[in-house]
Amino acid sequence: LLTKDPQKAKHFVRIVSDKALERLISYLDNGTIYHGGKYDKTTRYLSPTILTDVSPDAPVMQEEIFGPIFPVLTFKQIEEVTEFVAKRERPLALYYFGKKGDYILRHTISGGTCINDVIMHIVNHDMPFGGVGNSGMGTYHGKESFMTFSHRRSVVSAPTFVDMPFRYMPYKLFNLIKKMV
């Protein structure tokens, strides 16, 4: 964040509404605050927060967070990770830290994935961003935004000077053609 006190940083945005801030504050009890966890209701500030010891059934793991809270889950075996992801709704973002990123990509489905990093798939406007399943449909950023919010229309234009009878039932001419072939 390039600052020792993110609360005073001009570039660090505030939470959009009181309701959204209350929802995010309620997530702070869903695990152990490893870093951050500070908030100010009057300015709708919530510090970047890392949560550990989070139960997979905790509300912070059931909903899309849309705030500066990063729950961290640890696994002993890579198969546990892919099984965990497969049993839930497809996430908008999947962040994996480890040496088996290719395995994660082959065995999971998510809107976007970062291997050994976070958020970069969202801030890079040359990469499509969007969800899958409950986390959304379609993508945006750059050309993807144009394609998502455009409509490609299918058009069939038949000539008016001739109307081929073999297009209509009963398809006798089609049977004749099949016999000849």
Task: Write out the residue ranges for each language-model feature.
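Flexible, acidic loop-helix segments that line cofactor/substrate-binding pockets
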Residues: 1-26, 38-45, 62-67, 125-126, ...
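A structural signal for alpha-helix termini and helix-coil/disorder junctions
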Residues: 3-4, 30, 151-155
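Basic phosphate/pyrophosphate-binding loop/patch that engages nucleotide-derived ligands
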Residues: 26-32
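Short secondary-structure junctions
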Residues: 32-38
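Conserved C-terminal structural/oligomerization subdomain of aldehyde/semialdehyde dehydrogenase
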Residues: 45-181
